[in-house]
Amino acid sequence: MMRAWESRPDCSVVDEPFYACYLKETGADHPMREQILASQSTSREAVAKRLSAAAMTDLQYEKHMTHHMPRGIDLAWTRNIKHVFLIRSPERVIASYREKMPSVSPDDIGIIRQRELFDEITELTGQRPPVVDSADVLANPKAMMREICAALCVEWVDGCMTDWKQGARPSDGVWAAHWYGSVKASSGFSAASVTPAKLSAQDLALAEEMRPHYAAMATCKLPRP
């Protein structure tokens, strides 16, 4: 999704700006921890202030991870921002996380927190944000990206949001070296996988635990009736 928005001539992107804050606050032992802490501010107030400042482009797309946004933080700065929530089946989320990390917990994948944030943003803004399922985007990228633009009242720009040049971007977080192999190799949205994710019994149980939260958000997904 970040590549799709950055391919627009009128849009810049910000990659996980609260990652260093999350690492400092939790002490989480993530790959490239020290490099991430050195690359970003660890002050939530400073990050929010920067994100609230005027952008260099007409549009600014921010990619946030729900586990970077813990319970109790001040979200007032997001009141006038347009939000979109991207959901993915619990099995796919867990399988993707397991490719890079030795263990996984509910807090690691952030599905419960995503549902909480959806409710918090709805209350804060007075509007229910659009929800997008990654499987729907991969099944029909152009149609779904059009839906997202329409929901955000953003003009569709033909020929750029579904295709892009391969390679790294200056906007990529320093953690891209560990996490973004497939992203850097991509030149567009990949085809949706039809092969079920292979999970251990323990991870399957976690997926079932997360399913009600995923299903609740899926009732709000685009395209809306």
Q: Over which residues does each language-model region extend?
A:
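PAPS-dependent sulfotransferase catalytic domain
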Residues: 62-160, 174-182
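Short, Asp-centered acidic motifs that coordinate Mg2+ and/or phosphate
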Residues: 59
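Charge-dense, low-complexity intrinsically disordered segments
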Residues: 34, 104-108, 201
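Internal hydrophobic scaffold segments of catalytic domains
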Residues: 1-20, 145-165
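Generic structural signal for helix capping and beta-alpha/helix-loop junctions
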Residues: 21-23, 93, 166
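PAPS-dependent sulfotransferase catalytic core
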Residues: 1-56
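PAPS-dependent sulfotransferases, especially Golgi type II membrane carbohydrate sulfotransferases
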Residues: 155-225
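Short, basic, helix/turn surface patches
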Residues: 39-48, 115-118, 183-191
